[in-house]
Protein backbone atom coordinates (compact mmCIF):
# COMPACT_ATOMS: atom_id res chain seq x y z
CA UNK A 1 0.00 0.00 0.00
CA UNK A 2 1.38 3.41 -0.98
CA UNK A 3 2.19 5.81 1.83
CA UNK A 4 -0.08 8.77 2.41
CA UNK A 5 1.45 12.04 1.26
CA UNK A 6 1.71 14.85 3.81
CA UNK A 7 2.06 18.54 2.99
CA UNK A 8 2.63 21.42 5.38
CA UNK A 9 2.16 25.17 5.33
CA UNK A 10 4.15 26.90 8.08
CA UNK A 11 3.16 30.45 9.02
CA UNK A 12 4.55 32.99 11.46
CA UNK A 13 7.91 33.41 13.12
CA UNK A 14 11.08 31.34 13.24
CA UNK A 15 9.94 29.78 16.52
CA UNK A 16 6.92 28.46 14.65
CA UNK A 17 9.26 27.20 11.94
CA UNK A 18 11.04 25.07 14.54
CA UNK A 19 7.69 23.61 15.59
CA UNK A 20 6.97 22.78 11.95
CA UNK A 21 10.37 21.15 11.55
CA UNK A 22 9.72 18.98 14.61
CA UNK A 23 6.40 17.79 13.17
CA UNK A 24 7.95 17.12 9.76
CA UNK A 25 10.71 15.16 11.46
CA UNK A 26 8.10 12.98 13.12
CA UNK A 27 5.83 12.35 10.12
CA UNK A 28 8.60 11.73 7.55
CA UNK A 29 9.20 8.22 8.90
CA UNK A 30 5.56 7.22 8.50
CA UNK A 31 4.44 9.19 5.46
CA UNK A 32 5.76 10.64 2.22
CA UNK A 33 6.32 14.41 2.27
CA UNK A 34 5.28 16.72 -0.55
CA UNK A 35 5.48 20.46 -1.20
CA UNK A 36 2.54 20.30 -3.59
CA UNK A 37 -0.86 20.60 -1.86
CA UNK A 38 -2.52 19.12 -4.95
CA UNK A 39 -0.73 15.83 -4.22
CA UNK A 40 -1.21 15.80 -0.44
CA UNK A 41 -3.57 13.34 1.23
CA UNK A 42 -2.95 15.11 4.54
CA UNK A 43 -2.34 18.86 4.88
CA UNK A 44 -1.01 20.47 8.07
CA UNK A 45 -1.33 24.23 8.58
CA UNK A 46 0.89 25.46 11.40
CA UNK A 47 -0.78 28.74 12.31
CA UNK A 48 0.24 32.03 13.88
CA UNK A 49 -2.10 33.83 16.27
CA UNK A 50 0.04 36.68 17.55
CA UNK A 51 -1.59 39.73 15.93
CA UNK A 52 -4.69 40.38 13.84
CA UNK A 53 -2.90 40.29 10.49
CA UNK A 54 -1.32 36.94 11.33
CA UNK A 55 -4.62 35.51 12.54
CA UNK A 56 -6.34 36.48 9.31
CA UNK A 57 -3.54 34.95 7.23
CA UNK A 58 -3.87 31.71 9.21
CA UNK A 59 -7.64 31.57 8.74
CA UNK A 60 -7.35 32.30 5.02
CA UNK A 61 -4.69 29.62 4.62
CA UNK A 62 -6.83 27.00 6.38
CA UNK A 63 -9.74 27.84 4.08
CA UNK A 64 -7.48 27.74 1.01
CA UNK A 65 -6.12 24.32 1.98
CA UNK A 66 -9.63 23.03 2.72
CA UNK A 67 -10.48 23.51 -0.97
CA UNK A 68 -8.14 20.63 -1.82
CA UNK A 69 -10.59 18.30 -0.08
CA UNK A 70 -13.01 18.71 -2.96
CA UNK A 71 -10.68 19.58 -5.83
CA UNK A 72 -7.81 17.15 -5.19
CA UNK A 73 -6.58 14.39 -2.86
CA UNK A 74 -6.79 15.91 0.61
CA UNK A 75 -8.62 13.66 3.06
CA UNK A 76 -7.42 15.20 6.32
CA UNK A 77 -6.84 18.84 7.27
CA UNK A 78 -4.89 19.47 10.48
CA UNK A 79 -4.54 22.89 12.12
CA UNK A 80 -1.76 23.39 14.65
CA UNK A 81 0.08 26.24 16.33
CA UNK A 82 -0.65 29.49 18.11
CA UNK A 83 -4.09 30.16 16.62
CA UNK A 84 -5.38 26.75 17.70
CA UNK A 85 -3.83 27.09 21.14
CA UNK A 86 -5.34 30.54 21.58
CA UNK A 87 -8.90 29.83 20.47
CA UNK A 88 -9.33 26.07 20.95
CA UNK A 89 -12.93 24.85 20.72
CA UNK A 90 -14.10 28.23 19.45
CA UNK A 91 -11.95 27.79 16.35
CA UNK A 92 -13.31 24.29 15.75
CA UNK A 93 -16.87 25.60 15.90
CA UNK A 94 -16.12 28.45 13.50
CA UNK A 95 -14.12 26.30 11.07
CA UNK A 96 -15.64 22.83 10.60
CA UNK A 97 -13.19 22.36 7.72
CA UNK A 98 -10.59 21.42 10.36
CA UNK A 99 -10.47 17.66 11.00
CA UNK A 100 -7.81 17.64 13.72
CA UNK A 101 -6.56 20.48 15.90
CA UNK A 102 -3.33 20.40 17.89
CA UNK A 103 -2.00 23.12 20.20
CA UNK A 104 1.58 24.33 20.53
CA UNK A 105 2.41 21.58 23.03
CA UNK A 106 0.80 18.68 21.19
CA UNK A 107 3.23 18.00 18.36
CA UNK A 108 4.29 14.65 19.84
CA UNK A 109 0.73 13.49 19.13
CA UNK A 110 0.85 14.24 15.41
CA UNK A 111 1.40 10.66 14.16
CA UNK A 112 -1.06 9.22 16.67
CA UNK A 113 -3.71 11.75 15.66
CA UNK A 114 -3.24 11.00 11.96
CA UNK A 115 -3.38 7.24 12.50
CA UNK A 116 -6.50 7.48 14.65
CA UNK A 117 -8.24 9.44 11.91
CA UNK A 118 -7.16 6.96 9.25
CA UNK A 119 -8.51 4.14 11.42
CA UNK A 120 -11.90 5.82 11.70
CA UNK A 121 -11.59 7.66 15.02
CA UNK A 122 -12.72 11.17 14.12
CA UNK A 123 -12.46 12.67 17.61
CA UNK A 124 -10.88 16.10 17.34
CA UNK A 125 -7.81 16.45 19.57
CA UNK A 126 -7.85 19.33 22.05
CA UNK A 127 -4.95 21.66 22.87
CA UNK A 128 -2.93 20.74 25.97
CA UNK A 129 -2.14 23.25 28.70
CA UNK A 130 1.49 24.36 28.54
CA UNK A 131 2.22 23.34 32.13
CA UNK A 132 1.87 19.68 31.17
CA UNK A 133 4.72 19.76 28.68
CA UNK A 134 8.50 20.05 29.02
CA UNK A 135 10.91 21.27 26.36
CA UNK A 136 11.99 18.45 24.04
CA UNK A 137 12.80 19.35 20.46
CA UNK A 138 13.24 15.82 19.11
CA UNK A 139 14.31 15.01 15.56
CA UNK A 140 13.77 17.89 13.13
CA UNK A 141 13.61 18.16 9.38
CA UNK A 142 15.48 21.40 8.69
CA UNK A 143 13.66 23.67 6.21
CA UNK A 144 16.19 26.51 6.07
CA UNK A 145 19.22 26.57 3.77
CA UNK A 146 21.56 23.70 4.55
CA UNK A 147 24.18 25.84 6.26
CA UNK A 148 21.79 27.65 8.64
CA UNK A 149 19.46 26.40 11.37
CA UNK A 150 17.44 27.92 14.18
CA UNK A 151 18.13 26.51 17.64
CA UNK A 152 15.49 27.08 20.30
CA UNK A 153 16.94 27.44 23.80
CA UNK A 154 13.76 28.26 25.75
CA UNK A 155 10.00 28.41 25.42
CA UNK A 156 7.34 30.69 26.86
CA UNK A 157 7.65 34.12 28.44
CA UNK A 158 7.33 35.69 31.90
CA UNK A 159 7.47 39.34 30.81
CA UNK A 160 3.71 39.89 30.36
CA UNK A 161 3.94 43.05 28.26
CA UNK A 162 0.49 44.62 28.13
CA UNK A 163 0.13 44.28 24.34
CA UNK A 164 1.27 40.66 24.07
CA UNK A 165 -0.76 37.45 24.14
CA UNK A 166 2.25 35.10 23.92
CA UNK A 167 2.43 34.16 27.64
CA UNK A 168 -1.18 32.96 27.41
CA UNK A 169 -0.40 30.96 24.26
CA UNK A 170 3.11 29.66 24.93
CA UNK A 171 3.03 29.60 28.72
CA UNK A 172 5.59 30.41 31.36
CA UNK A 173 9.30 30.73 30.58
CA UNK A 174 11.04 27.33 30.44
CA UNK A 175 14.71 26.90 29.55
CA UNK A 176 16.03 23.80 27.83
CA UNK A 177 18.82 21.96 29.58
CA UNK A 178 22.23 23.02 28.30
CA UNK A 179 23.09 19.40 27.50
CA UNK A 180 20.02 19.11 25.27
CA UNK A 181 20.92 22.29 23.37
CA UNK A 182 24.50 21.16 22.78
CA UNK A 183 23.42 17.68 21.70
CA UNK A 184 21.05 19.08 19.09
CA UNK A 185 23.66 21.57 17.88
CA UNK A 186 26.18 18.76 17.35
CA UNK A 187 23.68 16.84 15.21
CA UNK A 188 22.99 19.97 13.18
CA UNK A 189 26.72 20.49 12.62
CA UNK A 190 27.12 16.87 11.51
CA UNK A 191 24.49 17.56 8.85
CA UNK A 192 26.33 20.56 7.45
CA UNK A 193 24.96 23.45 9.50
CA UNK A 194 27.50 26.25 9.91
CA UNK A 195 25.33 29.01 11.37
CA UNK A 196 23.23 28.54 14.51
CA UNK A 197 20.58 31.16 15.25
CA UNK A 198 19.53 31.05 18.90
CA UNK A 199 15.87 31.84 19.48
CA UNK A 200 13.29 31.96 22.26
CA UNK A 201 10.62 34.42 23.29
CA UNK A 202 13.36 35.80 25.57
CA UNK A 203 16.89 34.50 25.01
CA UNK A 204 18.64 36.75 27.52
CA UNK A 205 16.99 35.17 30.55
CA UNK A 206 18.05 31.67 29.54
CA UNK A 207 18.82 29.50 32.55
CA UNK A 208 17.30 31.68 35.24
CA UNK A 209 14.49 29.17 35.87
CA UNK A 210 16.55 25.95 35.95
CA UNK A 211 19.97 27.17 37.10
CA UNK A 212 18.96 30.12 39.26
CA UNK A 213 20.94 32.61 37.15
CA UNK A 214 21.36 33.73 33.56
CA UNK A 215 23.49 31.33 31.53
CA UNK A 216 23.26 32.48 27.92
CA UNK A 217 26.98 33.25 27.93
CA UNK A 218 27.66 29.63 28.86
CA UNK A 219 25.46 28.40 26.00
CA UNK A 220 27.52 30.49 23.58
CA UNK A 221 30.78 29.19 25.04
CA UNK A 222 29.75 25.54 24.75
CA UNK A 223 28.30 25.86 21.25
CA UNK A 224 31.50 27.51 20.03
CA UNK A 225 33.39 24.30 20.84
CA UNK A 226 31.43 22.32 18.24
CA UNK A 227 33.43 21.48 15.13
CA UNK A 228 31.84 22.83 11.96
CA UNK A 229 29.94 25.67 13.59
CA UNK A 230 31.29 29.00 12.31
CA UNK A 231 28.62 31.54 13.29
CA UNK A 232 26.38 31.75 16.36
CA UNK A 233 23.74 34.47 16.18
CA UNK A 234 21.41 35.55 19.01
CA UNK A 235 17.90 36.95 18.48
CA UNK A 236 15.22 38.22 20.90
CA UNK A 237 17.47 39.74 23.58
CA UNK A 238 15.56 41.87 26.07
CA UNK A 239 17.89 44.87 26.63
CA UNK A 240 17.20 45.11 30.37
CA UNK A 241 18.29 41.48 30.80
CA UNK A 242 21.64 41.81 29.00
CA UNK A 243 24.42 41.32 31.53
CA UNK A 244 28.19 41.86 31.71
CA UNK A 245 29.25 38.22 31.27
CA UNK A 246 27.16 38.00 28.11
CA UNK A 247 28.69 41.15 26.64
CA UNK A 248 32.17 39.84 27.43
CA UNK A 249 31.47 36.46 25.83
CA UNK A 250 30.22 38.10 22.64
CA UNK A 251 33.30 40.31 22.51
CA UNK A 252 35.89 37.52 22.97
CA UNK A 253 34.22 34.55 21.25
CA UNK A 254 35.19 34.53 17.57
CA UNK A 255 32.27 32.29 16.59
CA UNK A 256 29.61 34.54 18.11
CA UNK A 257 28.44 37.11 15.59
CA UNK A 258 28.83 40.70 16.74
CA UNK A 259 25.10 41.10 16.17
CA UNK A 260 22.22 41.39 18.62
CA UNK A 261 18.48 41.69 18.16
CA UNK A 262 17.06 43.98 20.87
CA UNK A 263 13.25 44.28 20.67
CA UNK A 264 12.90 47.57 22.57
CA UNK A 265 9.41 48.35 21.09
CA UNK A 266 9.57 52.08 21.98
CA UNK A 267 11.81 54.67 23.60
CA UNK A 268 9.37 57.05 25.33
CA UNK A 269 9.19 56.32 29.06
CA UNK A 270 5.48 57.09 28.95
CA UNK A 271 4.84 54.42 26.32
CA UNK A 272 7.29 51.93 27.83
CA UNK A 273 5.44 52.15 31.14
CA UNK A 274 2.05 51.62 29.51
CA UNK A 275 3.49 48.67 27.60
CA UNK A 276 4.59 47.08 30.85
CA UNK A 277 8.22 47.04 29.76
CA UNK A 278 10.65 46.65 32.63
CA UNK A 279 13.08 49.31 31.49
CA UNK A 280 13.45 53.00 30.67
CA UNK A 281 14.74 55.16 27.85
CA UNK A 282 17.87 55.93 29.84
CA UNK A 283 18.59 52.26 30.52
CA UNK A 284 18.05 51.28 26.88
CA UNK A 285 20.42 53.96 25.57
CA UNK A 286 22.92 53.06 28.27
CA UNK A 287 22.84 49.40 27.22
CA UNK A 288 23.29 50.32 23.56
CA UNK A 289 26.30 52.45 24.48
CA UNK A 290 27.77 49.61 26.57
CA UNK A 291 27.44 47.17 23.69
CA UNK A 292 28.99 49.56 21.20
CA UNK A 293 31.84 50.35 23.56
CA UNK A 294 32.69 46.74 24.42
CA UNK A 295 31.89 44.79 21.24
CA UNK A 296 33.79 46.01 18.16
CA UNK A 297 31.65 46.65 15.08
CA UNK A 298 28.53 45.28 16.73
CA UNK A 299 25.35 45.42 14.64
CA UNK A 300 22.15 46.15 16.55
CA UNK A 301 18.65 45.37 15.31
CA UNK A 302 15.39 46.28 16.99
CA UNK A 303 11.64 46.10 16.50
CA UNK A 304 9.29 48.98 17.29
CA UNK A 305 5.56 49.35 17.84
CA UNK A 306 3.90 52.60 16.78
CA UNK A 307 0.35 53.65 17.55
CA UNK A 308 0.24 52.08 21.00
CA UNK A 309 -2.69 53.38 23.11
CA UNK A 310 -1.83 56.78 24.51
CA UNK A 311 1.17 57.36 22.22
CA UNK A 312 1.13 61.15 21.98
CA UNK A 313 2.74 63.31 19.33
CA UNK A 314 5.47 64.05 21.87
CA UNK A 315 6.06 60.33 22.41
CA UNK A 316 6.25 59.72 18.68
CA UNK A 317 8.63 62.64 18.14
CA UNK A 318 10.83 61.19 20.87
CA UNK A 319 10.94 57.93 18.92
CA UNK A 320 11.85 59.76 15.72
CA UNK A 321 14.67 61.60 17.48
CA UNK A 322 15.94 58.26 18.78
CA UNK A 323 16.02 56.81 15.25
CA UNK A 324 17.91 59.84 13.92
CA UNK A 325 20.46 60.14 16.73
CA UNK A 326 21.18 56.57 17.89
CA UNK A 327 21.23 55.18 14.32
CA UNK A 328 20.55 51.50 14.93
CA UNK A 329 21.67 49.29 12.06
CA UNK A 330 18.40 47.43 11.49
CA UNK A 331 14.85 48.38 12.47
CA UNK A 332 11.52 46.64 11.97
CA UNK A 333 8.33 48.62 12.60
CA UNK A 334 4.86 47.30 13.39
CA UNK A 335 1.59 49.10 14.00
CA UNK A 336 -0.03 48.24 17.32
CA UNK A 337 -2.52 45.38 17.04
CA UNK A 338 -5.37 45.45 19.57
CA UNK A 339 -5.46 41.88 20.88
CA UNK A 340 -8.37 40.65 22.97
CA UNK A 341 -7.32 39.27 26.33
CA UNK A 342 -4.46 41.73 26.77
CA UNK A 343 -4.47 44.74 29.15
CA UNK A 344 -3.65 47.13 26.30
CA UNK A 345 -6.82 46.15 24.44
CA UNK A 346 -8.99 47.85 27.05
CA UNK A 347 -6.80 50.92 27.54
CA UNK A 348 -8.21 54.33 26.77
CA UNK A 349 -6.77 56.57 24.05
CA UNK A 350 -6.67 53.95 21.29
CA UNK A 351 -5.04 55.34 18.12
CA UNK A 352 -6.82 55.46 14.75
CA UNK A 353 -5.54 53.01 12.13
CA UNK A 354 -4.75 55.83 9.70
CA UNK A 355 -2.52 57.50 12.28
CA UNK A 356 -0.78 54.21 13.07
CA UNK A 357 -0.03 53.58 9.40
CA UNK A 358 1.25 57.11 8.86
CA UNK A 359 3.57 56.79 11.85
CA UNK A 360 4.86 53.43 10.62
CA UNK A 361 5.68 54.91 7.23
CA UNK A 362 7.39 57.92 8.80
CA UNK A 363 9.64 55.75 10.97
CA UNK A 364 10.55 53.48 8.05
CA UNK A 365 11.44 56.50 5.92
CA UNK A 366 13.76 57.78 8.65
CA UNK A 367 15.35 54.37 9.06
CA UNK A 368 15.82 54.06 5.32
CA UNK A 369 17.99 57.19 5.43
CA UNK A 370 19.97 55.77 8.37
CA UNK A 371 20.42 52.45 6.57
CA UNK A 372 21.64 54.12 3.38
CA UNK A 373 24.19 56.13 5.36
CA UNK A 374 25.45 53.05 7.21
CA UNK A 375 25.68 50.97 4.02
CA UNK A 376 27.63 53.64 2.13
CA UNK A 377 30.34 53.40 4.78
CA UNK A 378 30.75 49.70 3.98
CA UNK A 379 31.91 50.23 0.40
CA UNK A 380 35.51 49.04 0.11
CA UNK A 381 35.32 46.74 3.14
CA UNK A 382 35.77 42.98 2.98
CA UNK A 383 33.38 40.53 4.65
CA UNK A 384 33.09 36.80 5.10
CA UNK A 385 29.83 36.01 3.31
CA UNK A 386 27.79 32.83 3.65
CA UNK A 387 26.51 32.06 0.14
CA UNK A 388 22.89 30.86 0.12
CA UNK A 389 21.75 30.78 -3.51
CA UNK A 390 22.37 31.80 -7.11
CA UNK A 391 19.71 33.80 -8.98
CA UNK A 392 21.19 33.37 -12.45
CA UNK A 393 23.19 36.59 -12.30
CA UNK A 394 24.46 36.95 -8.74
CA UNK A 395 25.25 34.70 -5.85
CA UNK A 396 23.27 35.87 -2.82
CA UNK A 397 24.55 35.65 0.72
CA UNK A 398 24.87 37.31 4.10
CA UNK A 399 27.62 38.68 6.30
CA UNK A 400 27.61 38.46 10.09
CA UNK A 401 25.67 41.74 10.00
CA UNK A 402 22.60 40.11 8.44
CA UNK A 403 20.11 37.61 9.85
CA UNK A 404 18.09 35.59 7.32
CA UNK A 405 14.65 36.78 6.23
CA UNK A 406 14.59 39.95 8.37
CA UNK A 407 17.72 41.79 7.17
CA UNK A 408 19.21 42.58 3.78
CA UNK A 409 21.62 40.51 1.71
CA UNK A 410 24.80 40.80 -0.35
CA UNK A 411 24.71 40.27 -4.11
CA UNK A 412 28.02 38.66 -5.04
CA UNK A 413 29.76 38.73 -8.42
CA UNK A 414 32.77 36.69 -9.50
CA UNK A 415 33.95 33.10 -9.83
CA UNK A 416 34.58 30.66 -7.02
CA UNK A 417 31.50 31.25 -4.89
CA UNK A 418 29.68 28.08 -3.81
CA UNK A 419 26.33 27.57 -2.12
CA UNK A 420 26.55 26.89 1.63
CA UNK A 421 30.19 28.02 1.71
CA UNK A 422 31.89 31.13 3.08
CA UNK A 423 33.61 33.52 0.67
CA UNK A 424 35.60 36.67 1.25
CA UNK A 425 33.75 39.46 -0.56
CA UNK A 426 34.75 43.07 -1.19
CA UNK A 427 31.83 45.52 -1.16
CA UNK A 428 31.59 47.65 -4.30
CA UNK A 429 28.15 49.23 -4.05
CA UNK A 430 25.61 50.15 -1.37
CA UNK A 431 21.84 49.93 -1.83
CA UNK A 432 19.12 50.96 0.63
CA UNK A 433 19.24 47.75 2.65
CA UNK A 434 21.45 45.46 0.55
CA UNK A 435 25.04 45.46 -0.69
CA UNK A 436 26.81 44.41 -3.90
CA UNK A 437 30.29 42.90 -3.85
CA UNK A 438 32.85 40.80 -5.69
CA UNK A 439 34.56 37.58 -4.63
CA UNK A 440 38.13 38.03 -3.49
CA UNK A 441 40.46 35.54 -5.22
CA UNK A 442 40.92 32.08 -3.67
CA UNK A 443 38.76 33.01 -0.71
CA UNK A 444 35.98 30.42 -0.57
CA UNK A 445 35.94 27.65 2.01
Swiss-Prot record:
It is found in: Cytoplasm. Residues 4-119 form the MTTase N-terminal domain. GO terms for cellular component: cytosol. GO terms for molecular function: 4 iron, 4 sulfur cluster binding; aspartic acid methylthiotransferase activity; metal ion binding; protein methylthiotransferase activity. Residues 143-373 form the Radical SAM core domain. Residues 376-441 form the TRAM domain. It catalyses: L-aspartate(89)-[ribosomal protein uS12]-hydrogen + (sulfur carrier)-SH + AH2 + 2 S-adenosyl-L-methionine = 3-methylsulfanyl-L-aspartate(89)-[ribosomal protein uS12]-hydrogen + (sulfur carrier)-H + 5'-deoxyadenosine + L-methionine + A + S-adenosyl-L-homocysteine + 2 H(+). It holds the Pfam family UPF0004. The keyword 4Fe-4S applies. GO terms for biological process: tRNA modification. InterPro entries: Elp3/MiaA/NifB-like_rSAM, Methylthiotransferase, Methylthiotransferase_CS, Methylthiotransferase_N, Methylthiotransferase_N_sf, NA-bd_OB-fold, Ribosomal_uS12_MeSTrfase_RimO, rSAM. Keywords: 4Fe-4S, Cytoplasm, Iron, Iron-sulfur, Metal-binding, S-adenosyl-L-methionine, Transferase. Binds 2 [4Fe-4S] clusters. One cluster is coordinated with 3 cysteines and an exchangeable S-adenosyl-L-methionine. [4Fe-4S] cluster 1 binds at residues 13, 48, 82. [4Fe-4S] cluster 2 binds at residues 157, 161, 164. Its cofactor is [4Fe-4S] cluster. Its EC number is 2.8.4.4. It is an enzyme of class 2 (transferase). Gene3D superfamilies: Methylthiotransferase, N-terminal domain, Nucleic acid-binding proteins, tm_1862 like domain. Catalyzes the methylthiolation of an aspartic acid residue of ribosomal protein uS12. Belongs to the methylthiotransferase family. RimO subfamily. This is Ribosomal protein uS12 methylthiotransferase RimO. It comes from Clostridium perfringens (strain 13 / Type A).
